[in-house]
Curated annotation (Swiss-Prot):
Binding residue positions for ATP: L36, R37, G78, K81, T82, T83, E144, D145, Y146, R187, Y197, R234
Pfam families from the UniProt entry: AAA_lid_4, RuvB_C, RuvB_N
Family: Belongs to the RuvB family.
Organism expressing this protein natively: Polaromonas sp. (strain JS666 / ATCC BAA-500)
The organism's place on the tree of life at top rank: Bacteria
Residue ranges, annotated region (Small ATPAse domain (RuvB-S)): 198-268
Description of how the protein assembles with itself and partners: Homohexamer. Forms an RuvA(8)-RuvB(12)-Holliday junction (HJ) complex. HJ DNA is sandwiched between 2 RuvA tetramers; dsDNA enters through RuvA and exits via RuvB. An RuvB hexamer assembles on each DNA strand where it exits the tetramer. Each RuvB hexamer is contacted by two RuvA subunits (via domain III) on 2 adjacent RuvB subunits; this complex drives branch migration. In the full resolvosome a probable DNA-RuvA(4)-RuvB(12)-RuvC(2) complex forms which resolves the HJ.
Record's keyword annotation contains Coiled coil: no
Designated name of the protein: Holliday junction branch migration complex subunit RuvB
Sites where the protein binds Mg(2+): T82
Gene3D superfamilies: 1.10.8.60, P-loop containing nucleotide triphosphate hydrolases, Winged helix-like DNA-binding domain superfamily/Winged helix DNA-binding domain
NCBIfam families the record matches: PRK00080.1, ruvB
Length: 354
């Protein structure tokens, strides 16, 4: 199988604002992501522990002809929460209905989805932490008893009726598990945290995507893309497409180590997978705030970025790689951050260097 990208023309589409962002950049990119998305566990790479658990739970549900327990997937953006929801539905052999927390503004929005589910279907709610309290209240009896209460009529004549639902599985995805209310979190029978991918795992993903995109690539070129992708498949696939463009225009079309290095340098992606925004954040903490501790609001104002974007997209990888520390008093730059920027660390005055 191969994917022809003629149908994904970038004409009249806004450019990707930040190539290393783990958030989907545009409907155009989302369309390509869907085309590259694995549909079954046999095609899925990484998250070995989560995959093993889900395969067992799905197999048991199919054996008993029951709906799978409700599933909560959480972790940084771009790690495959949406992909896993599609795989769960495909492996169960059922329909998938997809929505997001911000879209479900009123109880009737959720009720319309729930009443149209068939037996054992999967309902995927992305950004489930952003459900409004009134919608969340409707969800509780649906998750526990497969029933919802809806109001008929208005004013004094209004009355509540109970509707039975088909058994279904809710798959909720969030980058902020801590923002879920306890009652909602407790209703998920399966909770799985997605971790950043290794360079080897991303290398396998890049090779698979290159094959689907008909992009000739050698092993060294593919691994260089993978190793700079911040442990995130979405970023790996985005970098692959940009390097392929460079190879087509500046080379022979073959993605080699040399082509990958030149293309990534053009994109301002350094060997650690950091881009301009990562370096701006580290430079701000070190130069403007003496290495920290500094609060997130001050960092956001300093680099001109949204607080939520810093917390959800930029800093998780910096923390995971040991360049930034999150403390009760604020963010602190580590020795690795000073070395990466070629800045001499302070001799004294910072707790982490004592």
């Amino acid at each position: 199988m191969s994917i022809q990208t003629d149908d994904f023309s970038a004409a009249d589409l806004p450019p990707v604002k930040r190539v290393m962002s783990a958030a989907p950049a545009s409907p155009h990119e989302e369309a390509i992501e869907r085309a590259l998305r694995p549909k079954l566990f046999d095609e899925y790479v990484g998250q070995a522990k989560v995959r093993e658990q889900l395969e067992i739970f799905i197999g048991a549900a199919k054996k008993r002809s029951e709906a799978l327990d409700h599933v909560l997937l959480f972790g940084p953006p771009g790690l495959g929460k949406t992909t896993l929801s599609h795989i769960i539905a495909h492996e169960l052999g059922v329909n998938l209905r997809q929505t997001s927390g911000p879209v479900l503004e009123k109880p009737k929005d959720l009720a319309a989805l729930l009443t149209n589910l068939e037996k054992n279907d999967v309902l995927f709610i992305d950004e489930i932490h952003r459900l409004s309290p009134v919608v969340e209240e409707i969800l509780y009896p649906a998750l526990e008893d497969y029933q919802i209460d809806i109001m008929i009529g208005e004013g004094p004549a209004a009355r509540s009726i109970k509707l039975d639902l088909q058994p279904f599985t809710l798959v909720g995805a969030t980058t902020r598990a801590g923002m879920l209310t306890n009652p909602l979190r407790d209703r998920f029978g399966i909770v799985a945290r997605l971790e950043f991918y290794t360079a080897e795992e991303l290398g396998r993903i890049v090779r698979r995507s290159a094959s689907l995109l008909n992009a000739p690539m050698d092993e060294e070129g593919g691994f260089e893309i993978a190793r700079r992708s911040r442990g995130t498949p979405r970023i790996a696939n985005r970098l692959l497409r940009r390097v392929r463009d460079y190879a087509d225009v500046k080379g022979t079309g073959q993605i080699t180590l040399d082509i990958a290095n030149k293309a990534l340098a053009m994109l301002d992606v350094d060997p650690q997978g950091f881009d301009v925004m990562d370096r701006k954040l580290l430079e701000a903490v070190i130069h403007r705030f003496d290495g920290g501790p500094v609060g997130l609001d001050n960092i956001a104002a300093s680099i001109g970025e949204e607080r939520d974007t810093i917390e959800d997209v930029i800093e998780p990888y910096l923390i995971q790689q040991g360049y930034l520390q999150r403390t009760p008093r604020g963010r602190i730059a580590t020795l690795a951050a000073y070395r990466h920027l070629g800045v001499a660390p302070p001799v004294s005055g910072n707790d982490m260097f004592t």
